[in-house]
């Protein structure tokens, strides 16, 4: 558990969604210290739960190679203020190995700081046009993250609900694209099953 994600998984910022090559408001830099921290937590096989980015992502860190380290669940903000988006496809960032769901802006990337990161899911905001504060919060990709740990199966079930929904209804559109997801503990040291 920490304040922020250890990768720069935001490419566009602010009300006008301007492109920013490297987001230094993350744990992506300095790279040597970032890699040292990940090397330490990899041994724990822990899911890295974090926030602070106003943008929900599910990603996996790479140090020596793509996907050799812990998964990161950057949960959505309950009331996203400063808008951020992860839109690498829009700016032509090279990628490889999209997940099986083949959603845009997912796959293996080098972030703006040169870190290896596999982005499995992202909850980008919509264009905010509504004056109602609850509708606006929904459009800005506010929401709720839920982690269910199964200690016998050694899995983490990750749910990522949008803001203005009823989570008790089994509607797949209640969650951001790419969720829910189940990750096995051993995947946090690069023994990957999810693709």
List each language-model region with its residue ranges.
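Long, structured stretches of catalytic cores involved in phosphate-ester chemistry, encompassing
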Residues: 1-195
